[in-house]
Amino acid sequence: SALSSYNSTVDISQLSSENYVGVWQYGGNNNNVSINQSGGNDNLANVSQGFIYTDGAYNFTTPVYNTENNTASITQVGGDNSNRLFQLGDNNDFTLTQAGDGNTVGGRDLEPNVPVGRNGYFEQDGNNNLFTGLQADGATLKHESFQFGDENEIDLLQGASDEALIQQSGNLNTVTNHQGGGGNTSSVV
């Protein structure tokens, strides 16, 4: 496809408050995104790998499922930051680091024309995908977060007063959720 990206790398640093970054890598393999939002509050990062919007209105009517080996890394330091991720295909990795109060995965609804189910999320569709996360100080892994497919893995380390709702559908999937401190909740579905 003319819209496919292969072996591309995007590296973005935003070191203040109220920033937005959106990266879409369409339909290709071996793509890498690294986002660093440190030193500020109210930042939003959006990463989408392996699908194409066919109508320009966030409609996933023609997803590309043959993507693989894509990586995304998001680091957010500060308060009230949020991010969302969507990866389609196999052998994709998502690494998340958040430090500060009120940070979320699957966060704020900043795009009013996008359906709620597609506005804030972490989602990986495919096999052998990995999500590694570190969250501290009252962070939330939102209920819109999913892994679909087989042999997927979630490894999440959270500090005090954190919340996680982890949903996986498929076979031979694993979840490791370490929560330290008080006031934590965790559900695995």
Tell where the protein language model's regions lie, with residue ranges.
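Low-complexity repeat regions of mature extracellularly deployed or surface/particle-associated proteins
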Residues: 1-189
